[in-house]
């Protein structure tokens, strides 16, 4: 309804909606497509509770939709990337179908998923409503929250921010053409979601510092970004990826990030634990095969959730595991206060492809000064120590100026 000034969501605990709490949002207009967009934020939901909600405007509402909250003490999430529905071929129907199959299979096999993390490239062109329609077409998405990440294809247009409603956005000195960095907390886990289209070292450092300073009691720190800085395929050798590796590897080392979830490559893989840009292969394991108090950070790269996988066989020094297959896959990640377990499955075979387990006996981190306004020296050295960084900076400046 283009005449509505605001969107409304009503949430209750029974499907007949006789009792509910109402949340009112604001309307905006997508400057590219002219569509009206309504964003509503609901608060106060309790864990382990079944809710029903309706949405609408001007007194007209949808049918009730069920939404179930689960525990925050221990939980499981679904990790995918590169849905990347493209309207160039069959209006995106085949890719939408494969994406629905991937999501449906994952949820059928895991009825205890709390929410979904997408590591970027939700659509192919970033400016087409029909591609977003394909990405958001699975009915299951109405009952699950999905934390999205800006990818290089999302930045091709300006529609991305009209389809997401992210919390705790950080607006730095460099303008983002599509959306900002943001963070969110679920239980003991702090998720730090980066827009890797932003090359500003200072902004990314201050954003990370701000997120961590506001969550000093988190026992896990998870970075989510689109570009696979320790990835599986040809993109890992691209100049922009090398630039990003210089920025983010130092950032992740400095703030002792435990796990980094990425996409971009359309090819599943897992790095060794990385520190100071080098694999740390000498780790301590328990009887269950879990890494105990690891040194460094492990980086994961997801395949394409819509089946647009690449068949490439690269042997990078940082790669511990890779799965070269046209079969789409998905990963589940289970957290407790002291443990992390990632399992990856093939969509067609339903067989487990990979597993990575971490156990912490010490959940503390080095202290940070929330008032520090400088920049990490090692981060700056890595950033400026690459000849291609200077070229890339010039390209980025030219892009904003022209």
Regions found by a protein language model. Name each.
Residues 96-156, 254:
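Core catalytic region of metal-dependent phosphoesterases/phosphodiesterases
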Residues 79-81, 115-121, 125, 145-152, ...:
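Active-site neighborhood of phospho(di)ester-bond hydrolases with catalytic His/Asp-centered motifs
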Residues 101-104, 108, 373-402:
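Alpha-helical segments with a strong preference for the paired helices of cellulosomal dockerin domains
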Residues 218-260, 272, 278:
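Active-site-proximal segments of metal-dependent phosphoesterases and phosphodiesterases across multiple
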Residues 36-42, 50-66, 130-221, 247-248, ...:
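Extended active-site neighborhood of metal-dependent phosphoesterases/phosphodiesterases
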Residues 85-89, 123-128, 152-158, 180, ...:
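Active-site environment of divalent metal-dependent phosphoester hydrolases
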Residues 1-89, 108-109, 326, 336-375:
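Acidic, histidine-bearing metal-coordination/catalytic regions of metal-dependent phosphoesterases
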Residues 20-33, 78-101, 165-173, 231-238, ...:
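Acidic/histidine-rich helix-loop elements
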